[in-house]
């Protein structure tokens, strides 16, 4: 009865467009209340336990570092660097947008933040250059999801906490997949631009490249410091996030000199409100996960999938389908916190590497950010150019989703793509 009430309440609340954190918390409360055998204060205790983690401190700290870097002027410097690398080819500005998103992903760890930081500059520039409006917005929405793949990634932190995997290893495992996704989108843009005759008016020079590299190098050093510090044994992932905050303050105030007291306060405020929302989602998702575990739902799912999937290849296919559907309907952090522990026995039974599957799971969630009805990146990108209908953006982004699904299959069935770098950083 508990699972039925939980599922029904969650479905109704989601249909009513209630915020996901409230959906998870209210559905969990109602299920326990109707059951009557578990003291309700235990639900609050489980919510507290879900966020009482030193590792989860990395989430607000990485968000603060990303916002400080953005307000400190890193976005326009990364765009300038990208312009001098790929700006001269067919689809120049589209590819500049993608490369800039890849660079910014290594600083922010958030997909929506990446879309806003790069898109607010590049979408108007692309439209002015003659690119289609829907295409311009769609490419930013698609490229923005790289923000949760290339480290530091908030979703990798959530996954690591949910199943006890090494966050440092997850960060390393996300590098090559993130780069491949970016290059795949760039190839797609190049082909589309040649078909439509979207030539670039940008004329990059080597001197311009060196100048833009010099200006942006301080921002590009941040992910190197983070990963180098973790694997050099200097600090933990959470401590690396704190170091990133201090580094961002130093660069913003003393190097770029674009940070001041006012925009520093705004950075902390924006990061604080966003991370509070994420941590509330994690708290309520943890409580729901505990209820599902108590009701032996993970065991039932494991038995059902084990009977359906006769090999690890078919199992991975089933899991991908489940994750893609979930990613379309649920906030990524909540989905990871709930499904991670449910899938864990299956992964261990099939001898699937947890780091490799972490990349697969996060890529699925990232693609879900492009897919209705949730499609958060589509709505964030559309807010940059409000006169474009959502339907036209969805039409423009659909071929890009197909490209990303091909990438997903590669990451799923060729684990070495995710794990090869671990051999050199172990």
Predicted segments — roles?
Residues 1-426:
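Alpha-helical transmembrane segments of multi-pass membrane transport proteins
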């Amino acid at each position: 009865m508990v699972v039925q009430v939980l599922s029904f309440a969650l479905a109704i609340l989601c249909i009513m467009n209630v915020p996901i954190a409230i959906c998870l918390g209210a559905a969990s409360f109602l299920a326990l209340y109707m059951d009557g055998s578990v003291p309700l204060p235990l639900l609050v205790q489980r919510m507290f336990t879900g966020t009482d983690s030193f590792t989860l401190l990395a989430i607000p700290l990485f968000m603060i570092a990303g916002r400080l870097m953005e307000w400190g002027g890193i976005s326009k410097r990364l765009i300038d660097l990208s312009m001098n690398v790929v700006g001269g080819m067919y689809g120049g500005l589209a590819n500049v947008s993608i490369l800039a998103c890849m660079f910014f992903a290594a600083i922010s760890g958030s997909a929506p933040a990446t879309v806003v930081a790069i898109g607010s500059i590049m979408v108007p520039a692309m439209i002015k250059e003659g690119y289609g409006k829907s295409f311009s917005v769609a490419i930013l929405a698609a490229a923005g999801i790289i923000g949760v793949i290339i480290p530091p990634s908030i979703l990798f932190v959530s996954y690591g906490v949910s199943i006890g995997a090494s966050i440092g290893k997850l960060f390393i495992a996300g590098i090559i997949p993130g780069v491949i996704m970016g290059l795949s989108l760039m190839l797609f843009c190049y082909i589309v631009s040649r078909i439509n005759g979207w030539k670039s008016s940008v004329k990059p020079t080597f001197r311009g490249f060196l100048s833009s590299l010099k200006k942006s190098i301080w921002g590009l050093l941040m992910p190197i410091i983070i990963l180098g510090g973790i694997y050099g044994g200097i600090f933990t992932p959470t401590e690396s996030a704190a170091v990133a905050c201090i580094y961002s303050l130093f660069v913003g105030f003393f190097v770029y000199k674009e940070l001041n007291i006012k925009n520093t306060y705004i950075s902390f405020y924006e990061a604080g409100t966003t991370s509070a929302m994420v941590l509330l989602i994690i708290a309520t998702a943890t409580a729901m996960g505990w209820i599902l575990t108590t009701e032996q739902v993970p065991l039932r799912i494991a038995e059902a999938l084990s009977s359906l999937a006769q090999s690890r290849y078919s199992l991975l296919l089933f899991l991908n389908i489940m994750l893609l559907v979930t990613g379309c309907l649920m906030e990524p952090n909540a989905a990871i916190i709930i499904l991670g522990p449910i899938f864990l026995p299956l992964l261990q039974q099939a001898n699937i590497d947890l780091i490799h599957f972490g990349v697969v799971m996060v890529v699925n969630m990232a693609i879900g950010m492009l897919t209705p009805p949730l499609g958060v990146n589509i709505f964030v990108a559309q807010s940059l150019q409000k006169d474009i209908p959502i339907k036209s953006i969805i039409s423009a982004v659909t071929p890009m989703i197909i490209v990303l699904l091909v990438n997903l299959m590669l990451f799923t069935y060729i684990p070495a793509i995710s794990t090869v770098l671990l051999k050199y950083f172990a």
